[in-house]
Swiss-Prot record:
Keywords, in A-Z order: Chaperone, Cytoplasm, Leucine-rich repeat, Neurogenesis, Repeat
GO cellular component, one term: cytoplasm
A Pfam family hit: CAP_GLY
Gene designation per UniProt: Tbce
LRR repeats: 155-180, 181-204, 209-232, 235-258, 260-284, 285-310, 315-337
The protein, known as: Tubulin-specific chaperone E
GO BP, one annotated term: microtubule cytoskeleton organization
Domain CAP-Gly: 31-75
CDD domains (alphabetical): Ubl_TBCE (cd17044)
Organism of this sequence: Drosophila melanogaster (Fruit fly)
Its job: Tubulin-folding protein which is required for the development of the neuronal microtubule network. Essential for the development and function of neuromuscular synapses. Likely to promote microtubule formation by acting in the negative regulation of the microtubule-severing protein spas.
Length: 523
């Protein structure tokens, strides 16, 4: 019995991955179970509800699981067969089983018969397929029982490899794959549970990964950022790292003399990082251009303080930030904080429940001076001018009160509205606008509606709460327009150089701050 158990232990080292049906698990124990004959494998299932216990049977602990019902004992014979990456790739891309044809025997037969034209049926077809196999640039063997490399040196053109959801369970296996593929730059290891490498293993294996530029470790069971940083010592030249769906929770500052020296992209989607203070710990990643922190439950964006006319010396290269599906409760404050980032050009964010995309777009554009795209929508010069002008008018009274309240009052205003001093430089002092905003407003306003093509002008008294869509209907009727609905914009009577598009048909003139004697242009 001891010999049999030793053989099982040799075949299933602790940490080995197994698959039964659609269920994946990790070997946590190999040996006897009291009261039961033979050798057993103690399995911790990826699905924490799949098992029957937590590693304790009849009061004795054999192994430990993360969930109360994550463990089971199974017979070794229940575990299905494994495969090499070589065999899995050939089967998927050639539909060819090498055991059916012994190519060396065929070549011997050709030589012995001295028949240069000797041909075995199907051999030419296999040769053509083999040629295509060698030229493959991308290979995916996801959802296969791969747990070893095999012979891969023929794949000299391979740049992208997907071995997600396989049975690869340690970095020695990954290294034996990578070292045979000199052109490999993109590696997807998602949904594999890999044993943490030792320091000596990292020293030994690191040369095998020097060509790697992009690696995806989605749902690989990481729960400690320190383990990520330790493992990252394997990839000295990594540019893009995916850690989606690993429950990290907390982060720590990175030692850039050792890891992430060239990192451009980091994906922390759904990693349970609920506090933005944790995100700022990565601010010393000076080469980072893209950061994805969507679906993390972040409610507030808070960055270190800096003067309103300055930018922070963190995330100095960050151009793209993904905040989608985080319950950020104060959009205006969040955008004001993000203006502190020196290079932010692209932002993705879900509108607040009490907001909509157009309102969010306007706030973001006016509050983040460097922003060029939001949710993939490009910010045009006209849209920026309109958004900035709305903010310029909205806080005109607050600005005037702050300037009259002394240095501290003005500093506090600029802290809460970082871009406002820039808007004053751009559009002038809002002092002459303040009396208009303070005065008791009539429900009706007189506006001049001018057709730009014909020059015809229509003086009209309209309700402040009239929608753009209703006004478009009146304009079409008055100017006898047919065909496409005309585009409208307005010019502030006191600042005729500012042209603001009325680009949301559902909004009112009051929303756009159209005032008495302003001009509406029909385009």
């Amino acid at each position: 019995m001891v010999g049999i158990i030793d053989e099982v232990q040799l075949f299933y080292p602790l940490g080995t991955r197994i698959k039964i049906g659609d269920n994946y698990g990790t070997v946590r124990y190999v040996g006897e179970v009291s009261g039961h004959m033979g050798s057993w494998l103690g399995i911790e299932w990826d699905d924490g509800l799949r098992g029957k216990h937590n590693g304790i049977v009849d009061g004795k602990r054999y192994f430990q699981t993360q969930t109360p019902t994550g463990g089971s004992f199974i017979r070794p014979g229940k575990v299905g067969p494994c495969a090499t990456l070589e065999d899995a790739a050939r089967e998927r891309y050639l539909n060819y089983d090498s055991s059916n044809v012994d190519e060396s025997l065929i070549r011997e037969a050709q030589a012995s018969l001295q028949a240069s034209l000797f041909e075995v049926v199907g051999m030419d077809k296999i040769a053509r397929k083999q040629s295509k196999f060698e030229q493959l640039e991308e290979v995916s063997v996801d959802q296969t029982p791969v747990n070893a490399a095999g012979y891969l040196k023929e794949l000299t053109h391979l740049t992208t490899l997907n071995v997600s959801h396989t049975l690869i369970w340690n970095w020695e296996i990954v290294a034996s794959i990578a070292q045979q593929l000199p052109s490999l730059t993109n590696l997807n290891l998602s949904s594999n549970r890999l044993v943490l490498p030792t320091s000596s293993q990292i020293t030994e294996l690191e040369p095998s990964f020097r060509q790697l530029k992009r690696i995806n470790l989605r749902s690989c069971g990481f729960s400690d950022w320190k383990d990520v940083m330790h493992t990252a010592l394997l990839w000295p030249n990594i540019l893009s790292l995916g850690l989606q769906e690993n429950s990290l929770g907390q982060l720590a500052e990175v030692d850039r003399t050792k890891i992430f020296k060239q990192l451009h992209e980091l994906d922390l989607h759904r990693t349970n990082i609920m506090d933005f203070d944790q995100v700022t710990k990565l601010g010393n990643l000076t080469t980072l251009r893209l950061l994805n922190i969507m679906e993390n439950g972040i409610e507030e964006i808070k960055l270190p303080d800096c003067d309103s006319q300055e930018k922070l010396n963190i995330f100095v290269s960050l151009e793209q930030l993904n905040l989608l599906h985080n319950p950020i409760w104060n959009e205006a404050d969040a955008f004001n904080e993000l203006d502190k980032l020196p290079q932010l050009k692209r932002l993705s964010k879900t509108p607040h429940l009490k907001s909509n995309f157009d309102e969010m777009f306007s706030k973001a554009v006016a509050s983040i001076a460097s922003l060029q795209f939001i949710n993939k929508a490009e910010v045009t010069a006209e849209q920026r001018r309109g958004a900035e002008y709305d903010i310029w008018k909205k806080y005109a009274l607050d600005w005037m009160q702050a300037t009259q309240g002394g240095t501290d009052s003005l500093r506090e205003f600029c802290r809460r509205h970082r871009t406002y001093p820039l808007l004053v430089k751009k559009y002038g002092s809002p002092a002459d606008f303040v009396p208009r905003s303070q005065a008791k407003q009539s429900n009706l306003i007189n506006v001049s509606i001018r057709h730009q093509l014909t020059g015809e002008t229509w003086e009209k008294k309209v309700p402040r709460m009239i929608t753009v869509q209703t006004l478009q209907g009146l304009v079409m009727k008055r100017f006898r327009l047919s065909g496409d609905v005309p585009q409208l914009c307005y010019v502030d009577a006191l600042h005729p150089d500012l042209v603001v598009p009325l680009d949301n048909n559902a909004k009112t003139l009051d929303f756009y701050s159209v005032q008495e004697h302003d001009t509406v242009l029909v385009q």
